[in-house]
Design a protein with these regions (language model features):
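Carbohydrate-associated surface elements
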Residues: 179, 194-197, 206
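Conserved catalytic-core segment of nucleotide-activated headgroup transferases in glycan assembly
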Residues: 95-100, 199-262
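N-terminal subdomain of nucleotide-sugar transferases
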Residues: 1-63, 243-246, 250
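A short beta-strand/loop micro-motif in the catalytic core of glycosyltransferases
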Residues: 39, 169-177, 192, 225
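A short, histidine- and acid-enriched strand-loop-helix "catalytic/donor-clamping" loop
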Residues: 129, 144-156
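An aromatic- and histidine-rich active-site surface loop
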Residues: 99-103, 118-136
Length: 262
């Protein structure tokens, strides 16, 4: 296997960089550690905003104010872009405006920084992102299908239709589950499945933890732990069933909460 290095890579992310650590962060870190330069473009959304998004919107505005027209150099090989956009991904007017302003900003930045002949990796299949990618005209387009976003989309049919088009047009497609691999393979012969992995050294280091956290010291017996975002993706019914069935086990959820779990 040839190591990818000394390349310019643009990542269109489906999350913001400040979000809890996920596949997107691991990919970016791995690419920069391998000698590539990465422009990480924060989430432009696959749905309209909800009331629960208010905190993230405020954080984005604060970061944008501190940056240079939305761009921020994190390290010598890692650059972050926080775009301002109209949050209606399937409105023709919003698509036109968002495409124009986001692409114009990227074009100016790549020209100034000599960020030429980029490879594009996109976690988003939305119409705006696809139009921007065509305008960039990258040497390679990769759709990283990390989640079935249509399951929770407000407009699942529109998102699915847009994703189908992106599956047909992308040079390479990466999936993270057999189900998504099978679906993507209906539209492309260039699909590879890479299930999410584990950074073993991070998990192994927990065995050497100096002490139990103060807010968990009163827990007796075995613990089933979950670390990650507490969102609609989490099957709360299964968790409740586990808690009821395994009466001598405590279930602990650790992470930012975006849904009501009471």
């Amino acid at each position: 296997m040839t190591l990818l290095t000394q390349q310019n890579i643009i990542i269109f992310s489906s999350i913001d960089w400040s979000t809890h650590w996920q596949l997107h962060h691991e990919l970016t870190t791995s690419l920069t550690n391998s000698g590539n330069k990465v422009l990480f473009i924060e989430n432009t959304g696959a749905r309209s905003p909800k009331s629960g998004d208010f905190g993230r919107i405020i954080n984005r505005i604060r970061f944008r104010i501190k940056s240079f027209h939305g761009f921020h150099q994190v390290s010598d090989k890692f650059f972050l872009y926080t775009p301002i956009f109209i949050p209606y991904p399937y409105s023709k007017f919003a698509i036109f405006i968002n495409t124009f302003f986001i692409f114009s900003a990227i074009k100016r930045w790549t020209k100034v920084t000599n960020f030429i002949n980029p490879i594009v990796v996109s976690f988003l299949p939305t119409p705006t992102i696809q139009l921007i990618i065509r305008k960039i005209n990258p040497t390679l387009t990769i759709y990283y299908c990390a989640d079935d976003m249509a399951r929770f989309a407000q407009n699942p049919n529109k998102l699915r239709e847009s994703e189908n088009e992106f599956l047909r047009s992308s040079d390479l497609i990466f999936t993270t589950s057999h189900k998504m691999y099978e679906r993507a393979s209906k539209f492309s012969d260039s699909v590879s499945n890479f299930p999410a992995g584990v950074a073993f050294e991070k998990f192994n280091s927990s065995l050497k933890a100096p002490s139990v956290p103060e807010d968990m010291q009163a827990i007796e017996g075995k613990i089933i732990g979950y670390v990650g975002a507490i969102t609609e993706v989490l099957n709360l019914n299964i968790i409740v069933e586990l808690a009821t069935t395994l009466s001598h086990t405590t279930i602990v959820l650790i992470g930012p909460k975006y849904i009501n779990v009471s």
